[in-house]
Amino acid sequence: HLTQPTLSRQLMQLEEELGVTLFRRSRHRIILTEDGMLLRRRAEEIVSLAEKTKDDFRHTQDHLSGTIAVGSGELQSSRFLTQLIAAFQRDNPLVSFRIYSGNSDNIKERIERGLLDIGLLQEPVDISKYNFIRTPIHEHWGVLVSAESELAAKSNVTPADLAGIPLILPDRENVQNELLNWFGPYAEKLHITATGNLLYNLAFLARDSQSCVVTLNLACHYDGLLFVPLSPKLESGTVLVWKKTQTFSSAASAFIAYSKEYISGML
Protein backbone atom coordinates (compact mmCIF):
# COMPACT_ATOMS: atom_id res chain seq x y z
CA HIS A 1 0.00 0.00 0.00
CA LEU A 2 1.14 3.55 -0.75
CA THR A 3 0.52 6.52 1.52
CA GLN A 4 -1.15 9.59 0.01
CA PRO A 5 2.03 11.74 0.12
CA THR A 6 4.04 8.98 -1.57
CA LEU A 7 1.41 8.52 -4.28
CA SER A 8 1.18 12.28 -4.88
CA ARG A 9 4.95 12.50 -5.17
CA GLN A 10 5.06 9.63 -7.67
CA LEU A 11 2.33 11.23 -9.77
CA MET A 12 4.24 14.52 -9.87
CA GLN A 13 7.39 12.66 -10.88
CA LEU A 14 5.46 10.96 -13.67
CA GLU A 15 4.25 14.33 -14.95
CA GLU A 16 7.82 15.65 -14.92
CA GLU A 17 9.07 12.57 -16.76
CA LEU A 18 6.39 12.83 -19.47
CA GLY A 19 6.51 16.62 -19.68
CA VAL A 20 2.73 17.00 -19.50
CA THR A 21 0.06 17.85 -16.93
CA LEU A 22 -1.94 14.73 -16.14
CA PHE A 23 -4.24 16.12 -13.43
CA ARG A 24 -6.10 19.28 -12.55
CA ARG A 25 -5.81 19.60 -8.79
CA SER A 26 -8.15 21.32 -6.36
CA ARG A 27 -8.39 21.22 -2.58
CA HIS A 28 -10.75 18.26 -2.49
CA ARG A 29 -10.15 16.31 -5.69
CA ILE A 30 -8.06 15.80 -8.81
CA ILE A 31 -9.43 15.46 -12.36
CA LEU A 32 -7.71 13.85 -15.33
CA THR A 33 -6.67 16.17 -18.16
CA GLU A 34 -6.89 15.01 -21.79
CA ASP A 35 -3.28 13.84 -21.53
CA GLY A 36 -4.19 12.05 -18.32
CA MET A 37 -7.12 10.28 -19.98
CA LEU A 38 -4.86 9.24 -22.87
CA LEU A 39 -2.35 7.79 -20.40
CA ARG A 40 -5.14 5.92 -18.61
CA ARG A 41 -6.35 4.39 -21.89
CA ARG A 42 -2.83 3.32 -22.77
CA ALA A 43 -2.36 1.84 -19.29
CA GLU A 44 -5.61 -0.11 -19.63
CA GLU A 45 -4.43 -1.46 -22.99
CA ILE A 46 -1.09 -2.49 -21.46
CA VAL A 47 -2.85 -4.33 -18.63
CA SER A 48 -5.20 -6.00 -21.13
CA LEU A 49 -2.27 -7.05 -23.31
CA ALA A 50 -0.39 -8.39 -20.27
CA GLU A 51 -3.42 -10.46 -19.23
CA LYS A 52 -3.81 -11.74 -22.78
CA THR A 53 -0.13 -12.74 -22.85
CA LYS A 54 -0.55 -14.76 -19.64
CA ASP A 55 -3.62 -16.43 -21.15
CA ASP A 56 -1.63 -17.31 -24.29
CA PHE A 57 0.86 -19.30 -22.19
CA ARG A 58 -1.75 -21.01 -20.05
CA HIS A 59 -1.98 -24.62 -21.12
CA THR A 60 -1.94 -28.12 -19.74
CA GLN A 61 0.19 -31.03 -20.86
CA ASP A 62 -2.63 -33.08 -22.30
CA HIS A 63 -5.33 -30.57 -23.27
CA LEU A 64 -5.47 -27.36 -25.28
CA SER A 65 -6.35 -24.39 -23.08
CA GLY A 66 -6.08 -20.62 -22.92
CA THR A 67 -8.13 -17.61 -23.99
CA ILE A 68 -8.72 -16.47 -27.58
CA ALA A 69 -9.66 -12.82 -28.18
CA VAL A 70 -12.14 -12.36 -31.02
CA GLY A 71 -13.72 -9.21 -32.42
CA SER A 72 -17.01 -9.03 -34.32
CA GLY A 73 -19.30 -6.40 -35.74
CA GLU A 74 -23.07 -6.34 -35.41
CA LEU A 75 -23.72 -8.85 -38.18
CA GLN A 76 -25.91 -11.79 -39.12
CA SER A 77 -22.56 -13.53 -39.57
CA SER A 78 -22.04 -13.18 -35.82
CA ARG A 79 -24.40 -16.15 -35.45
CA PHE A 80 -22.07 -18.15 -37.69
CA LEU A 81 -19.15 -17.04 -35.48
CA THR A 82 -20.87 -18.13 -32.27
CA GLN A 83 -21.70 -21.52 -33.82
CA LEU A 84 -18.06 -21.86 -34.86
CA ILE A 85 -16.87 -21.02 -31.34
CA ALA A 86 -19.36 -23.43 -29.75
CA ALA A 87 -18.27 -26.27 -32.05
CA PHE A 88 -14.59 -25.60 -31.28
CA GLN A 89 -15.26 -25.54 -27.53
CA ARG A 90 -17.04 -28.89 -27.65
CA ASP A 91 -13.72 -30.39 -28.73
CA ASN A 92 -11.61 -28.07 -26.56
CA PRO A 93 -13.58 -27.34 -23.37
CA LEU A 94 -10.62 -25.73 -21.57
CA VAL A 95 -10.37 -22.93 -24.16
CA SER A 96 -12.31 -19.76 -23.37
CA PHE A 97 -13.08 -16.76 -25.59
CA ARG A 98 -13.05 -13.02 -24.98
CA ILE A 99 -15.49 -11.30 -27.35
CA TYR A 100 -15.15 -7.66 -28.39
CA SER A 101 -17.93 -5.88 -30.31
CA GLY A 102 -17.22 -3.01 -32.68
CA ASN A 103 -17.15 -2.04 -36.34
CA SER A 104 -14.48 -3.25 -38.75
CA ASP A 105 -12.21 -0.25 -38.17
CA ASN A 106 -12.36 -0.68 -34.37
CA ILE A 107 -11.56 -4.38 -34.67
CA LYS A 108 -8.64 -3.87 -37.06
CA GLU A 109 -7.15 -1.29 -34.70
CA ARG A 110 -7.28 -3.74 -31.80
CA ILE A 111 -5.79 -6.52 -33.93
CA GLU A 112 -2.89 -4.19 -34.82
CA ARG A 113 -2.31 -3.47 -31.12
CA GLY A 114 -2.22 -7.17 -30.29
CA LEU A 115 -5.42 -7.01 -28.23
CA LEU A 116 -7.37 -9.33 -30.55
CA ASP A 117 -6.30 -12.55 -32.24
CA ILE A 118 -9.02 -12.76 -34.87
CA GLY A 119 -11.73 -10.48 -36.24
CA LEU A 120 -14.96 -10.93 -38.17
CA LEU A 121 -15.14 -7.93 -40.50
CA GLN A 122 -17.85 -6.54 -42.75
CA GLU A 123 -16.83 -5.74 -46.31
CA PRO A 124 -15.82 -3.50 -47.99
CA VAL A 125 -12.67 -3.39 -45.85
CA ASP A 126 -8.91 -3.25 -46.50
CA ILE A 127 -7.49 -6.65 -45.53
CA SER A 128 -4.10 -6.36 -47.25
CA LYS A 129 -2.28 -6.88 -43.91
CA TYR A 130 -4.22 -9.99 -43.01
CA ASN A 131 -4.73 -13.62 -43.81
CA PHE A 132 -8.43 -14.24 -44.19
CA ILE A 133 -11.26 -16.65 -44.85
CA ARG A 134 -14.34 -15.32 -46.61
CA THR A 135 -17.51 -16.59 -44.93
CA PRO A 136 -20.47 -17.91 -46.95
CA ILE A 137 -22.84 -15.50 -45.18
CA HIS A 138 -24.24 -12.45 -47.01
CA GLU A 139 -25.45 -9.41 -45.10
CA HIS A 140 -28.58 -7.70 -46.50
CA TRP A 141 -29.11 -3.93 -46.41
CA GLY A 142 -32.31 -2.06 -45.68
CA VAL A 143 -33.73 0.70 -43.51
CA LEU A 144 -35.23 0.75 -40.03
CA VAL A 145 -38.25 3.05 -40.19
CA SER A 146 -41.04 4.07 -37.87
CA ALA A 147 -43.92 1.61 -37.95
CA GLU A 148 -46.17 4.62 -38.65
CA SER A 149 -44.12 5.76 -41.65
CA GLU A 150 -45.45 5.36 -45.19
CA LEU A 151 -42.25 3.46 -45.96
CA ALA A 152 -43.18 0.77 -43.41
CA ALA A 153 -46.01 -0.39 -45.68
CA LYS A 154 -43.64 -1.03 -48.59
CA SER A 155 -42.10 -4.41 -49.38
CA ASN A 156 -38.86 -2.60 -50.24
CA VAL A 157 -37.52 0.94 -50.63
CA THR A 158 -35.72 2.54 -53.57
CA PRO A 159 -33.22 5.42 -53.72
CA ALA A 160 -36.07 7.69 -54.82
CA ASP A 161 -38.11 6.72 -51.73
CA LEU A 162 -35.29 7.85 -49.42
CA ALA A 163 -34.34 11.10 -51.18
CA GLY A 164 -34.90 14.05 -48.82
CA ILE A 165 -35.88 11.87 -45.83
CA PRO A 166 -33.78 12.27 -42.62
CA LEU A 167 -31.27 9.42 -42.75
CA ILE A 168 -28.83 7.90 -40.26
CA LEU A 169 -25.85 6.19 -41.91
CA PRO A 170 -23.00 3.96 -40.73
CA ASP A 171 -19.91 6.04 -39.99
CA ARG A 172 -17.36 3.87 -41.84
CA GLU A 173 -16.17 5.72 -44.94
CA ASN A 174 -15.87 2.57 -47.08
CA VAL A 175 -19.45 1.61 -46.27
CA GLN A 176 -20.75 5.13 -46.88
CA ASN A 177 -19.13 5.12 -50.33
CA GLU A 178 -20.82 1.81 -51.14
CA LEU A 179 -24.18 3.21 -50.06
CA LEU A 180 -23.69 6.42 -52.06
CA ASN A 181 -23.02 4.29 -55.13
CA TRP A 182 -26.29 2.49 -54.48
CA PHE A 183 -28.17 5.80 -54.27
CA GLY A 184 -26.74 6.82 -57.66
CA PRO A 185 -28.09 10.18 -58.87
CA TYR A 186 -30.16 10.54 -55.69
CA ALA A 187 -26.99 10.75 -53.54
CA GLU A 188 -26.97 14.54 -53.97
CA LYS A 189 -30.47 14.74 -52.49
CA LEU A 190 -29.72 12.84 -49.28
CA HIS A 191 -30.54 14.44 -45.94
CA ILE A 192 -28.06 12.82 -43.53
CA THR A 193 -28.82 13.81 -39.93
CA ALA A 194 -26.44 11.48 -38.06
CA THR A 195 -23.89 8.69 -38.39
CA GLY A 196 -22.85 5.98 -35.95
CA ASN A 197 -20.98 2.72 -35.55
CA LEU A 198 -23.43 0.38 -33.77
CA LEU A 199 -27.14 -0.01 -34.35
CA TYR A 200 -28.52 -0.16 -30.80
CA ASN A 201 -28.26 3.58 -30.06
CA LEU A 202 -29.03 4.57 -33.64
CA ALA A 203 -32.33 2.71 -33.46
CA PHE A 204 -33.40 4.78 -30.45
CA LEU A 205 -32.40 7.96 -32.28
CA ALA A 206 -34.41 6.92 -35.32
CA ARG A 207 -37.48 6.29 -33.22
CA ASP A 208 -37.21 9.58 -31.31
CA SER A 209 -36.31 11.77 -34.30
CA GLN A 210 -38.51 10.13 -36.97
CA SER A 211 -35.41 9.31 -39.01
CA CYS A 212 -34.52 6.19 -41.01
CA VAL A 213 -31.44 4.11 -40.21
CA VAL A 214 -29.72 2.60 -43.24
CA THR A 215 -28.48 -0.67 -41.77
CA LEU A 216 -27.91 -4.36 -42.21
CA ASN A 217 -30.76 -6.71 -41.42
CA LEU A 218 -29.83 -8.08 -37.99
CA ALA A 219 -33.19 -9.78 -37.39
CA CYS A 220 -33.55 -7.79 -34.17
CA HIS A 221 -36.79 -6.30 -32.85
CA TYR A 222 -36.94 -2.63 -31.92
CA ASP A 223 -40.23 -1.31 -30.54
CA GLY A 224 -41.92 1.05 -32.99
CA LEU A 225 -39.51 0.30 -35.86
CA LEU A 226 -39.71 -2.00 -38.87
CA PHE A 227 -37.01 -3.22 -41.26
CA VAL A 228 -37.62 -2.69 -44.99
CA PRO A 229 -35.13 -4.12 -47.55
CA LEU A 230 -33.45 -1.99 -50.20
CA SER A 231 -34.32 -2.33 -53.89
CA PRO A 232 -32.26 -2.92 -55.92
CA LYS A 233 -30.87 -5.43 -53.44
CA LEU A 234 -27.60 -4.52 -51.72
CA GLU A 235 -25.47 -7.14 -49.95
CA SER A 236 -22.14 -7.16 -48.10
CA GLY A 237 -19.77 -10.06 -47.50
CA THR A 238 -17.85 -10.82 -44.32
CA VAL A 239 -14.34 -12.11 -43.70
CA LEU A 240 -12.59 -13.76 -40.76
CA VAL A 241 -9.10 -12.19 -40.51
CA TRP A 242 -5.86 -12.51 -38.53
CA LYS A 243 -2.45 -10.82 -38.87
CA LYS A 244 -0.03 -12.30 -41.39
CA THR A 245 3.03 -11.60 -39.24
CA GLN A 246 1.71 -12.56 -35.81
CA THR A 247 2.86 -15.56 -33.78
CA PHE A 248 -0.22 -17.06 -32.14
CA SER A 249 -0.79 -19.09 -29.01
CA SER A 250 -1.47 -22.80 -29.43
CA ALA A 251 -5.17 -22.20 -28.78
CA ALA A 252 -5.49 -19.38 -31.34
CA SER A 253 -3.53 -21.34 -33.96
CA ALA A 254 -5.77 -24.36 -33.43
CA PHE A 255 -8.89 -22.18 -33.72
CA ILE A 256 -7.69 -20.65 -37.00
CA ALA A 257 -7.02 -24.13 -38.44
CA TYR A 258 -10.42 -25.32 -37.18
CA SER A 259 -12.12 -22.27 -38.74
CA LYS A 260 -10.65 -23.06 -42.16
CA GLU A 261 -11.99 -26.62 -42.02
CA TYR A 262 -15.35 -25.49 -40.62
CA ILE A 263 -15.93 -22.92 -43.36
CA SER A 264 -14.71 -25.21 -46.16
CA GLY A 265 -17.33 -27.70 -45.00
CA MET A 266 -20.05 -25.04 -45.42
CA LEU A 267 -19.14 -24.19 -49.03
Predicted regions and their residues:
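A short LG(V/I)-centered, amphipathic sequence patch enriched
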Residues: E15-L32
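Alpha-helical linker/hinge and terminal dimerization helices associated
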Residues: E17-L18, L39-Q61
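Central regulatory/effector-binding core of bacterial HTH transcription factors
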Residues: S65-D126, T195-L198
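A late-sequence structural motif
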Residues: F80, V228-L267
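Helix-turn-helix DNA-binding motif, specifically the short coil turn and the N-cap/start of the second
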Residues: L2-T6, Q10
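Secondary-structure junction motif
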Residues: Q122, I165-A187, F248-I256, M266
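Beta-alpha-beta core module
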Residues: S128-R134, H138-H140, N197-T247
